[in-house]
Amino acid sequence: MTSETSVNLLDFDAEGLVAYCGSLGEKPFRAKQLQRWIHQYNAGDFDGMTDLAKSLREKLKGRATIGMPEIASDHVSADGTRKWLIDVGNGNAVETVFIPEETRGTLCVSSQAGCAVNCRFCSTGKQGFSRNLSTAEIIGQLRMAEFALRASLGRAPGPNGKAERVVTNVVMMGMGEPLLNYNAVVPAMRLMLDDNAYGLSRRRVTLSTSGVVPMMDRLGAELPVALAVSLHAPNDALRDELVPLNKKHPLRELMAACQRYLKVAPRDFITFEYCMLDGVNDTEAHARELLAVTRDVPCKFNLIPFNPFPESGLIRSKPEQIKRFAQVLIDAGVVTTVRKTRGDDIDAACGQLAGAVKDRTRLAERTGTAAKIIEVRAV
């Protein structure tokens, strides 16, 4: 039986786990063994960790847990996209999405319950900010998804070789602004990269930010993974409206931060994400302005057709307009992709499942009834 003050071992990266084992009087190699059991063999308890001394297993049973996020619902799209809704307590939920492709499998991971940045086109931002996720809640999304996907394919837990791994890429592009939860996100990403955990390369872990400039610099100094920047506008006036954080860190400051980051980045370009909004930011003139503002930053563009949601007041750009916009960028020699819409039959926009939970919670608070996450049957 664990004590009320037990620690969740998923909260520790390698350094933290060494320190914790040291506090139990154990040598550093025990931390490596423990980490492999947790993150490579999906161990849920300590009794099965047969290469750990029985005395250590007994210590751990009295002091520690391997506490996973609670799955509220699991949805599978006709195109293979899979979305989990994770209950993080107090009527809050976050989403984790797996996107299978022919040569890779990408997991989109959330870092916060809600988001304080409040981008105009983002469903999550409309919910407001509830709290930061813990390291355990962040890395737990990858652990949950990797082993659930392996089980669905009949693959056993074990060291994450290329033949066994299902999740080949992680993008910190789910709910929340990762750089506003830096102290929990970075240890989680260290585990993603650790060969004794998930063993992904820095090129295969991408953090997406709306432009928290000071933390971009810190990330570059401490853990430079691939970087994506949510740009969405080619000038400060429009970006102030679409991405309010721009008022604090305007485009000139943001572009300078991107240049600094590239000096240490695992890739030689920044990915700029650009949500295509009909009549707002999608003209050829906007595209030319975009080229001008990013001219000193080696980059590629990822154009994202807007996923409509209630109360946004926005419309997705027409396919032909997206094509014209993209062509301006391509003609200038900039690599440009248009994101495919995936999983429309299970959720039209990131944050909508969690938003429905939030709406039910608010209704419960008004009516005095108990809030509860209701499981949604997989499609």
Curated annotation (Swiss-Prot):
S-adenosyl-L-methionine binds at G176, E177, S208, S230, L231, H232, N307. Gene3D superfamilies: 1.10.150.530, Aldolase class I. This is Dual-specificity RNA methyltransferase RlmN. Keywords: 4Fe-4S, Cytoplasm, Disulfide bond, Iron, Iron-sulfur, Metal-binding, Methyltransferase, rRNA processing, S-adenosyl-L-methionine, Transferase, tRNA processing. Signal peptide: none annotated. Its cofactor is [4Fe-4S] cluster. It holds the Pfam family RlmN_N. The active site is at E95 (proton acceptor), C350 (s-methylcysteine intermediate). It catalyses: adenosine(2503) in 23S rRNA + 2 reduced [2Fe-2S]-[ferredoxin] + 2 S-adenosyl-L-methionine = 2-methyladenosine(2503) in 23S rRNA + 5'-deoxyadenosine + L-methionine + 2 oxidized [2Fe-2S]-[ferredoxin] + S-adenosyl-L-homocysteine; adenosine(37) in tRNA + 2 reduced [2Fe-2S]-[ferredoxin] + 2 S-adenosyl-L-methionine = 2-methyladenosine(37) in tRNA + 5'-deoxyadenosine + L-methionine + 2 oxidized [2Fe-2S]-[ferredoxin] + S-adenosyl-L-homocysteine. Binds 1 [4Fe-4S] cluster. The cluster is coordinated with 3 cysteines and an exchangeable S-adenosyl-L-methionine. One of its GO terms (molecular function) is tRNA (adenine(37)-C2)-methyltransferase activity. The keyword Plastid does not apply. Its EC number is 2.1.1.192. InterPro entries: Aldolase_TIM (IPR013785), Methyltransferase_A (IPR040072), RlmN_N (IPR048641), RNA_MTrfase_RlmN (IPR027492), rRNA_lsu_MTrfase_RlmN/Cfr (IPR004383), rSAM (IPR007197). Specifically methylates position 2 of adenine 2503 in 23S rRNA and position 2 of adenine 37 in tRNAs. m2A2503 modification seems to play a crucial role in the proofreading step occurring at the peptidyl transferase center and thus would serve to optimize ribosomal fidelity. It comes from the Bacteria. It is an enzyme of class 2 (transferase). It comes from Burkholderia vietnamiensis (strain G4 / LMG 22486) (Burkholderia cepacia (strain R1808)). Disulfide bonds join C108-C350. Reaction proceeds by a ping-pong mechanism involving intermediate methylation of a conserved cysteine residue.
